[in-house]
From Swiss-Prot:
The chain crosses the membrane at residues 30-50, 113-132, 151-171, 199-219, 249-269, 284-304. Belongs to the nematode receptor-like protein sra family. It comes from the Eukaryota. GO terms for cellular component: membrane. Its main location: membrane. One of its GO terms (molecular function) is G protein-coupled receptor activity. Pfam families: 7TM_GPCR_Sra. InterPro entries: 7TM_GPCR_serpentine_rcpt_Sra. This is Serpentine receptor class alpha-20.
Length: 339
């Protein structure tokens, strides 16, 4: 078996003509510029999102901690992707006429693969933490309010366990053999990636369904509280739950759409690989990096949702103070109108 694997490695050491044409093509260079732009934008908005969570937080403390950890993970993932693509584009210029020096050996990519796939899976399973954060906030509100950090840390630990388990299933024990065009490609001897993509997709679909259900319950609860309660604290908490559930729902749907680019996209491309030339396949594949796109969507949603919510609050406060005077007077007017 080892001898066969070594022979396979030696036979694939040099890039084919199609692979050489792809790696040195304008298309792959354009993909580098495009992804570099996405990554730089994600850095910028990650800083803005972290500032918003720190200084103008509209989320619960539990949700905020989960989002901050996910943002930090996204920065590591984007940095890893940037380093991978810089190495690839460097080789495409320097070794454009040396096909045997264009591909990367598995050992050349070992560190990048470690960071790339761990942060990739951690980003995917953030939907689990955010979904169950919403579940706990609705069904166990007292516990959620009293122990916000214990809740978020517990969910992040479970998220990490999922991440490590998936990494172990996909890459642990895979022989350090084989060559790949770009270091984020799965090793040639790793065989479980289709199963992993199917599992990730199942988790995300489940989380979307649950989050939409929780959002519906929160909206229904807020309407009931508005009709029956004069407590501003209770009304504020209900409104916060609706806003948070809405944001989480948007995040999970965007994560699903982006990561589906990787999951379904990679599986589909592999299924039709026999109908594509080597050059065509390797021109398309560099664009299919859904988590990189998802890591731009995450800070965008956090930042703009925070700005929008703050703007709505200011407008609402302005209306209340200009039309009804102070809050006490407003409540008295409501009481009279309901008598």
């Amino acid at each position: 078996m080892n001898k066969t694997a070594e022979e396979l490695v030696e036979s694939l050491r040099c890039a084919s003509e199609g692979l050489t044409n792809a790696l040195t093509s304008i298309t792959v260079k354009v993909s580098f510029v495009f992804l570099a732009t996405v990554i730089l934008l994600s850095y910028y908005f990650a800083v803005l999102a972290i500032r918003a969570l720190w200084n103008n937080n509209i989320f619960s403390n539990s949700t905020r901690l989960i989002l901050i950890v996910c943002l930090l993970n996204s920065v590591v993932h984007q940095s890893t992707m940037m380093e991978i693509r810089i190495r690839q584009v460097y080789r495409s210029f320097v070794y454009s006429s040396e096909p045997c020096r264009l591909p990367f050996h598995f050992t050349d990519c070992e560190v990048e693969l470690y960071f790339y796939y761990l942060t990739n899976y951690f980003s995917t399973y953030s939907v689990f933490s955010l979904t169950f954060d919403r579940l706990i906030s609705y069904f166990f509100p007292k516990c959620y309010i009293s122990y916000p950090y214990q809740v978020s840390i517990s969910l992040l630990i479970i998220q990490l366990v999922f991440t490590l388990g998936t990494y172990y299933f996909g890459l642990y024990g895979v022989p350090k053999l084989g060559y790949v065009p770009i270091c984020n490609y799965a090793p040639r001897l790793a065989t479980n990636f289709v199963k992993i993509n199917d599992f990730r997709t199942t988790i995300m679909v489940f989380c979307i369904i649950v989050t939409i259900f929780i959002y519906y319950l929160n909206v229904k609860s807020e309407k009931q509280i508005k009709r029956t309660s004069y407590s501003l604290g209770e009304q504020y908490l209900a409104r916060e739950n609706v806003a948070t559930s809405q944001s989480v729902c948007i995040l999970i749907v965007l994560q699903f759409v982006c990561i589906s680019v990787s999951s379904f996209g990679v599986n589909y491309i592999k299924s039709i690989k026999s109908t594509l030339s080597d050059e065509e396949y390797n021109k398309i594949a560099p664009f299919v990096v859904g988590v990189t796109y998802a890591n731009l969507c995450l800070p965008l949603v956090i930042y703009f949702k925070t700005k929008l919510t703050i703007r709505k609050r200011r407008i609402r406060i302005g209306v209340m103070t200009s039309v009804y005077g102070d809050v006490g007077e407003h409540i008295n007017r409501l009481k009279k109108s309901w008598e």
